Structures are given as C-alpha cells and as structure tokens.
Amino acid sequence: MKPKNNKDKKSKFSYKETLNLLKTDFSMRANSVSREPQIQEFWLKNKIDLELGSSNLGEKFTLHDGPPYANGSLHMGHALNKVLKDIINKYKTLKGFKVHFVPGWDCHGLPIELKVLQSLKSHERKDLDSLGLRKKATDYAKIQIKNQLEGFKRWGIWGDWDNPYLTLKNNYESAQIGVFGKMFLNGYIYRGLKPVHWSPSSRTALAEAELEYPEEHYSSSVYVSLNISNLSDEILLKLEEKDLKNKLLSNLNKLFIAIWTTTPWTIPGNEAVAINPRINYVFAEDQNGDIFLFAKDLISEISEKLEREFNTLIDVKGSMLTGIEYKHPTKNKFCNIVIGGDYITTESGTGIVHTAPGHGMDDFNVGKKYHLPITCIVDEKGNLNNHAEKFCGLNVLKDANDLIIEDLKKNNLLLLKEKYKHRYPYDWRTKKPTIFRATEQWFASVEGFRSSALKAIEDVEWMPKTGKKRIYSMVVGRGDWCISRQRSWGVPIPVFYEKKGKEILLNSETINHIQKLFNEHGADIWWDWDEKDLLPKQYKEESDRWIKGLDTMDVWFDSGSSWAAVCEQREELAYPADLYLEGSDQHRGWFQSSLLTSVAVNNKPPYKKVLTHGFALDENGRKMSKSLGNVVDPNIIINGGSNQKIQPAYGADVLRLWVSSVDYSVDVPIGSNILKQLSDVYRKVRNTARYLLGNIHDYDPIDEEIDIDQLPILDQWMLNRLVDVSDQITIAYENYEFSKFFQILQSFCVVDLSNFYLDIAKDRLYVSAKSSIRRRTCQFVMSKIVENLAVLISPVLCHMAEDIWQNIPYSTNEKSVFERGWPNLPKSWINPELNERISNLRKLRVEINKAIEGCRTQQIIGAALETEVNYLPENEIIKNSLSWLEKFGNKEVDLYSDWLIVSKFNVVNNLFEDYLIIDDNELGKIQILKAKGQKCDRCWHYQSNTVMGIEDTKLCKRCANIITS
C-alpha cells in the first residue's frame, strides 16, 4: 500500500465567488414556535384551510368527527386521532373532493357535573337546583371547548372552528329528541323494571360502554348451606329405590343445598336457587353426617375447599330437583329450587346458583319465568333498604358483605369464605365498583332491530378487518340498551307520567312539540318550565294530570345521534358519512351507538367505512399516567418544556410526523427518544428541501421548458423515480397506510436524493457555467422535485410544505401549496428500463463508495475526488449497464466517474499493482488508486492537463473556460 500523500499546497486565492452557491430564505432551522403560527395565519387570511376544501368541485367527502369529551387538557390520544383525520382531509382536499370537516364535542354527562359540584362550597351545592347546575355545566363545557379548540388549531388541524357541533346546542338536542322519538314510535324504546348496571358512587344507571374492568379485583366469595325443608316427590322416589328415604326425612335438619356467591350482600334478596337440568347432581354425606346437594363434577373441588370427605348417597339429573324447598338463610320464609340455564356450569362454585331476581340479569330472567318477586334490596346510594330487613342501612360496597357473612356464620350456614379474583365492572368515571340493581328504566330494545344492525355491519368496510368481527360479536351478544340516567346534566327523556296512575304520555304529538321547543329554546326549559308550558296545546287543559320525567339520556345516545344532528342537517356533509375514525374502544362506544340509532331509525348504517387506531403508550409500552410520571404532553412537544435542553420545542409538524410514522392499527409508543429520531428525519427532509430551493434561486421554468428526451439519463431517471415515489405515496394515502408514506419519504429524501442524485448534482450546480445546459437541466429537474415534494408531504408536514412553497424563488400560479392539487405527472416521464439499468449502476456505486470510505477511514485520502477507480467486472448485467451508459449517456452529465464523484473511472481487463485498496465482491473487483495529475483549485478534480489560474492556482480546462467566459 502506498504511503500517505502530501496534501497539495493551498493557494491563498479562492474561486468561491465564481461558483453558483446555494441561496434561499428557507431556513435550515424550522423555528416552528414562531413560523408555524405565521403559516396558519397565512392560511386563515387567504381562506386556504376550510374554504379551500369546501369550494372544491368534486364529490363530497365526509369524515364525521367523533366528539371528544369537553373536559380536561388535550393528550396524545387526541393528537393521534385528530392528526390522522386531518391528514386524510388534507389529502382529499388536494385530490379535489369537497371536504368540510365539522369538529364536535360531547358536552353532557357525569364528569362535567362532578367538576361543577367539586368547584362549589358545601352550602353552594346544597342551594344548587338542577337548572343552576345545568347553567354552570354549560359554562364549564364551553371553557373546556375553547381551550381544546385552540390546541387543535395549533396542531394545524383544519375544520369549521367557527361552527363546530356541540351536543349542548339547541339544534343538536332537538335532533336527538327526534331520534329518540322515531325509535319510540318504531317500537324500539320501552320502560321497564330490569336489573341494570348501577353506580352507587354516581347514583345512576350505566350502559355497558360506561364500564371498565380492572385487572386486580377481588370479591368476598362464600359457600353457604341452605337447610332443605321439603323434598320433591321425584327425589323421594329416587331415595326409596336406594332405601334412603327414611334416613333423609328423619334428618331434614342435616340436609342442605350448597351454594356459592361472590355477592354476599344479595343473599337477603334470595328468592330461589337455580340448577342446570343437564348437569348431574349428588346428595353426598360428610363425616359429620351432614348431607349436601351439589354438582357431581365438583365433589373433589368442594371436598378440598371445605376440608371434608364426602360419600355419595344418590346421583340425580338436575331436572329432577325442581320443587325441593329450603329455608331462606336470613328471612322467615321458604323458597324452591328452580331450573336455570346454561349460565350454570361446573367451572366453579357448586353448580347451584343463588338467585336474587332484582340483582342480576340471569336471575331476573329466571324470576320472570317462575313469577318470583323482582325485589330490589338496595337504594340509589348502595344502602340496603327495608326489603333486606335486619340488614337495612348497610352499604353494599362497605359493611354489608362482612356483616351478612358474620350473620351466616352465627347461624352455622357459612361453609367457607375466601377472596376471589375475577372480572368485575367499575364505573369508568368514578373508578368505583358497580352493582346490578333492578329499577324502572328506559331501554332500547336491540332485539327488535338486531338482524338489521348485523346486516348493516356487513355493508360497512372495516379497517382493520378485525373490527368487523369485533363489533359483530358485540351486537350479536348485547342485551337491551339502558338509555336512562338519573342525572341533571343531559338531554331529558321527553316523557310525562300520570300523577295518580301508571299511564305515560309520550306520542308523536308530544315528541314533535318538545323537539320544536328545544330547537328554539334549548333543553334547559325542561327544568325551567312547568308541564302546562311544555305540553302541546291539546293537552294543556289537563296538564295537572301529568308530571314530567327527570331522567336524562345516556351520553352514548347523545353522541350516537350525531349522524342525525350533524350529517343529516348540514348541507355540506353527507349521510351516511364516508368515514368514521376513532380508537378501537369505540366498537363498544360511539361506533355501536351510532350504528344502533341509525339502523333503528333509517335501517342503514351511518357510515360507509370505519377506521380504528390504537392507544398512545410510553416508550416502554406502558399506559400513560401521572402516577408513573410517563405522560407525554403534546403541548410540550410543540412548544417545549421549562428546560428546553431536555424538552426542546419540536413544533406541530414533528408531532404530525410521529402520527404518520406509526402503525396506528395497534397501540403506539411515544417518548423523548422517539421524538429525537423523528426530529432527525424531519431535519433531513427539511435540509433536502432547502438544498433544492437554494439551487434554483436563479431559475425560471417559463424560460426553461425542456423536453424529457433532451435530458441526460440521470435526469430522466430522476423524473421517472419521482413518478414512482408519487404513485407509491398516493397509494399509501388512499389506503390510509401513512407509515408507508413515512418510509417512502425517508428513503426518497435520503437514499434517492441526498445520497445519490443531489450528491452527484453538486458539480453540475456549483461548478458549471451559470446558464449552461448542464446546470439548467439539473435545475429543471430540481424544480419539479421540490414542487411535487411539497405537495406530497403537505397532508402530513403541512407547515413545512407551505414554507417550501412560499420560498419557491419563481412565481407559481398557486399562492399556497394546497391550491396546487395532487400531482399528476406526465406519462412521458415513466421509463421502466431506466429503473433496472440504474438500479444496477447504483449497486456498483454503493460497493465502490464502501471501498473509498475504507481509504478515508485509514486517512489515505480526504475527498473521493483524490481517487481513480478501476473496475474489473465479474457480473455481465453490471458490465452491460456500464456499456449502455457510456453509449447513450450525456457526455457532460452521465460519465460514471461523475456519478461516483471520483476523478476517473475505468473498466479494465487487468488490475494495476499500484493501488490504495482493493475490494473483491460478487459484482467484480474494485481497485482504488490515487488520482493522477494535478488538482483543479476550482472544481477539485484531478486532471493530467491543467493551466495556470489566478495567483499561481491551477485550473482544469473546463474551469478555465468558464472563468474566461
């Protein structure tokens, strides 16, 4: 290997002023904190955002916004959701669709009501009536909406911010009454006594969508013995066959039914015990002579738990047990064994289920079947009432379980008490356990339109496809929807009850009248006006007969009516909407409530396509929480934290880039390391754009229209590659696969542009004569790249795209990048043959660059131009591609030495011995030599023939001619 060469003696004179150096006002730094708001102001002033999409002449595209709750600060979940929607809307706008995005807010419900109450002193709460609470809740919600709205706008989200939809607005509440009314008149809404999920902490009924199931819930479970007081005739015959009849009848005080329950507080409400007719049961005697009835398959488990040995006396089918009578465990009454259903299994317990019809849906159904009393033993606070007799006043979530268990123990009925871990429903707002409680509630009878809802699901496109299976199974299995709530902050159920009878007043006349009143005055009048003012004219004379109901509707009924209150009512929108896009939890929430109401009223789904995303997690895949200290605040991402070194201001575009980078169909991570990586990608894209802009500062496309056939091969390939990238990004946007856009963009800017085309172009741009064809053809291509790159990134990097557009140095027909429309590149640019040829040459270039980098690492050379490359081909495809380039390439641009940025490239039959480094791979042998000749002080190429320049400098002939001219 040759020793390190002495560096050329540097001249004091610099040819810098003779070079065509980069010139642009497009800053290398984004300065997002100040620049992004300026761009947003530009959009607003020039009516670029909302009005641009609304004025398009194409068909409507309606992405209907699922309303976030009007409470609390914006978080990363909001960012993921709203940015995804905005990317789609901006893309559709550029494609010419008529896009009018109406953002919305869900304004009613318990969290806001609780916030209002918590802000008041105790005497203020005491004096606050329902109307006063509603006015304070309205004020609170509007403040929250204003704060969230400003945050969304700062993220670059376009929408009808001056006219969003709010579920507290008059027209919305009126439309919701219309949906309720049509469902009632269609026979899908009824009032009935049923066990519902009841939240003692909120004092209201809850729907399934308002529940959550913590992982670490333990209940106090008990095994209880119920003393049999009478045996059925069928069992007596069976006993007689085994000669056991007299033994059991003479020892009834030792004959028991074994039950198991995880809700001991419901035992005072017991009205029966239920068995599965298909299960085999046994009467089994323990070592003390006590005889128990339980499922045969559970003998071993029960024996182990109770620490007793059992001897089976008789084995009977469950269907034979009906009619057996037992003494109630806490009351002076007798009950019977009844037949239950398949919910009774031998997976746990005893195979015999304690049945309290007022406190469980299965129990309720059994109670209805056998005409058992539907007794609710708990009040709205969770306190046991008079029906619980001696336990009245105990609270089911506090002391009731322990004291009832103690009573069972005292009466020798407690067999075992143990902690039992299982799924148990909690109120998602208060984070407290719920109970089943039978109350008079309003229900939507899903059974009445279930088949239509399932058909509607089939008609919708679900992304991902698993979403269809998920919502289908939920609708198949769901019971009737409890839509009434015992709270003040909501839309009232517009019903009047007879004061002295059981009749209700709810018909088309009252519904239409209330709907008109709410549209004019708002729902507050339900609490402000008396019955005479609320009733239609024909009922006013008998207004004293009626009293208005005070239940409000489930907030899921509120948001689930948005298709009627927004999409149907606003001319600029479409119903069904083209797209609903929310988190995957909305299969049981908004997607489902919207589907059920729309199908019940109009027999069709409210959406054509449903797209779901996962949740935002921290970098370690954990749920964000203040207690863990892992919350990522989108506001801090944009504006930076108190310590800007630790929490720099990245701007809205980096936040948006994060959304485009992730596979949002699953849960997605976010954190400081991820943000740093995204910031690097953002910077690379920005620097690429800056390089493009800076090198076309003296270019005007009007003067320089060039035919594709006149371009060098490298430029033709670059335009062909631009078409490929544009097509790939278009497909990614069309399929909502934004992570593919992110990957394509990154590869295009780094691999295709920075590392290849723009790297090669430096000599053409800086060194060539200013107006030479060699330079102008490159500028022509770069102008096409930068214009189309700006459009392609604009749905995601909207601020950067606009910044690029505003810094294009020549005049364009469009004042904004969003007025350009989506790229429709000339078909003449497409040349598949170039792709294959140049792909081969790029592979060779990569290998040669590795060899040159080896020289640089060993400090043998500084720049690649100090080298000469010999290549001995061993790959015919590469050899043919080099021959093709030499034959058809432009002699000023398509020299392979220029593509390598070396002083000379030779295809050889033999290698020289005098080399710096040699590399042998599947493409052939690559030899790196020290370049011969002298270095040109202007272009830094090494040439055999140089001339004297200024102040003893050396110039190659090319540079000498440029300087002279």
From Swiss-Prot:
It catalyses: tRNA(Ile) + L-isoleucine + ATP = L-isoleucyl-tRNA(Ile) + AMP + diphosphate. It holds the Pfam family tRNA-synt_1. Its cofactor is Zn(2+). Zn(2+) binds at residues 936, 939, 956, 959. Keywords: Aminoacyl-tRNA synthetase, ATP-binding, Cytoplasm, Ligase, Metal-binding, Nucleotide-binding, Protein biosynthesis, Zinc. One of its GO terms (cellular component) is cytoplasm. A motif ('KMSKS' region) lies at residues 623-627. It is an enzyme of class 6 (ligase). Signal peptide: none annotated. Binds 1 zinc ion per subunit. Catalyzes the attachment of isoleucine to tRNA(Ile). As IleRS can inadvertently accommodate and process structurally similar amino acids such as valine, to avoid such errors it has two additional distinct tRNA(Ile)-dependent editing activities. One activity is designated as 'pretransfer' editing and involves the hydrolysis of activated Val-AMP. The other activity is designated 'posttransfer' editing and involves deacylation of mischarged Val-tRNA(Ile). This is Isoleucine--tRNA ligase. It comes from Prochlorococcus marinus (strain MIT 9515).
